[in-house]
Amino acid sequence: MSSSDARSRIRDRGYSEVPRDTSCPDGTIRTFQSLHSSELAVSADPLPPPPLPLQPPFGPSFYSSDTEEPAVAPDLKPVRRFVPDSWKNFFRGKKKDPEWDNPVSDIRYISDGVECSPPASPARANHHPYKDPSRGSQGTFNSQHEADAMFAHDPYASLDRRTQTARTYSEKVEEYNLRYAYMKSWAGLLRILGVVELLLGAGVFACVTAYIHKDNEWYNLFGYTQPYGMGGLGSLGNTYGGYYYSGPKTPFVLVVAGLAWITTIIILVLGMSMYYRTILLDSNWWPLTEFGVNVALFILYMAAAIVYVNDTNRGGLCYYPLFNTPMNAMFCRVEGGQIAAMIFLFVTMIVYLVSALVCLKLWRHEAARRHREFLEQQEINDPSLSSKRKMCEAAISDRQRDQEVNVKDLRTTTKMTPELLSGHIPPGHIPKPIVMPDYVAKYPVIQTDDDRERYKAVFQDQFSEYKELSAEVQAILRKFDELDTVMSRLPHHSENRQEHERISRIHEEFRKKKNDPSFLEKKERCDYLKNKLSHIKQRIQEYDKVMNWDTQGYP
């Protein structure tokens, strides 16, 4: 028998046979690791095929013939790289399919970021009692402890973990907004201004340094003293409001630009840290300190700009014909880079001033935030303060809303247009319900002539009632006005006790007359009829306006 037939028989037997016995003679349970290939039995349920090897075999085929030479594994040598792969991947960026570049040993069973159902674990597929067909019911496992002993070391435990699902576009946008929402605040505006200041400062430094050779030529020609023969010009300049010029001040401008650049980058890096957001913004002194730093840099840049502009005309010497000779013309000529440097200096000065103003705004904003958090903490500690605050805010909002209502405008009253408020709704605010009169729904817009005649009949029928009630109510109100005038003349404090009691009784009776239910009912009915008739009249006038009818004969 050849060796290939033996290997094929062993391979076929491994797929068609299952463990025959799982217990030792002493009654103990053995795991899969302790089972031997010789202890196999026939079963209706074959074992699942083993997983494919992670590394393919070497050679032309796995089962080669005996005549072929045995495959020899290549001599693998460790690869030593001067630059680590992590650094290369960082500078190389992302690839479309990075899995294809990984070695075979790095390929995992579960992909990252793909939403899929994890495969079922073949080790713990069945939790019901297992029966051995060769032994009947004696091979039943009823204990979970025995099952755990059978699967002591589960090689597929990693498959039970939950896979990481891919994020949707909305989740990415939400994460982006949460990450960069800080840049929308006043502190974020300061960081943006800091980046602008760094760019402008670098421009100032580059433009000023590009023409520093002119200073070298000045010192080579005139030295470190005033130009020869210009002493009189110096005194002449003092006479006409000038000042003494001893040489270029470019080093001062470079020192100011460098100092401001270093200070700005320190503040910018500090502002992007969590220490700035959690500790410094909660303090009272840091926004004012940042304001002082920006003001100081603004003053330094203003001084540097003035000094650099003064250097371009050599302290005013270029305006004198005695100095502005062909030999000295190169010192008075202003190059394009120098003009750019002056522009950068003044723009940077303005940006630092804007940063100082933003620091003041940030200081006020953070103070208001701390005060609001303090009030919320007090409300949590003392619930009575929260109820009082809500009642106060509701009363203020009601008072403001009552002041805006115009009682004299009957058209607004009849239309009953709901009030539209825009802005922040205070906590605890309870809106007032809108009471819609019945005649608004009962008498809609007139569509036909019959509706107009019906509205006209209702108007004429109830107009007489309104006239009677109105005359009666107006008469009572006139009497009340006269009594008010008489009551105002009565003394409020009398020395006689009986007279004081009599005046008090008169006041009490007068108050009862004013609050008489029958009078209040008549007054309410009169107001209702007035609004109803106004509504009906408005409907008739609207219809007549559309139909171009003359309604002057109607009341």
From Swiss-Prot:
Topology relative to the membrane: Multi-pass membrane protein
Keyword Coiled coil belongs to the record: yes
Coiled coil ranges: 521-545
Taxonomic source organism: Mus musculus (Mouse)
PTM annotation, UniProt: Ubiquitinated by ITCH; but this ubiquitination does not lead to proteasomal degradation. Polyubiquitinated at Lys-408 via 'Lys-63'-linked ubiquitin chains; deubiquitinated by USP53. Phosphorylated.
Main location: membrane
Composition skew (Basic and acidic residues), residue ranges: 1-20
Function statement: Plays a role in the formation of tricellular tight junctions and of epithelial barriers. Required for normal hearing via its role in the separation of the endolymphatic and perilymphatic spaces of the organ of Corti in the inner ear, and for normal survival of hair cells in the organ of Corti.
Residues with PTM Phosphoserine: 117, 121, 158, 384
Expression by tissue: Detected in small intestine, stomach and kidney, in epithelial cells. Detected in pancreas, retina and lung, and in stria vascularis, utricle and the organ of Conti in the inner ear (at protein level). Predominantly detected in small intestine, lung and kidney, with lower levels in liver, testis and brain. In colon, expressed in the entire crypts.
Name of the protein this chain belongs to: MARVEL domain-containing protein 2
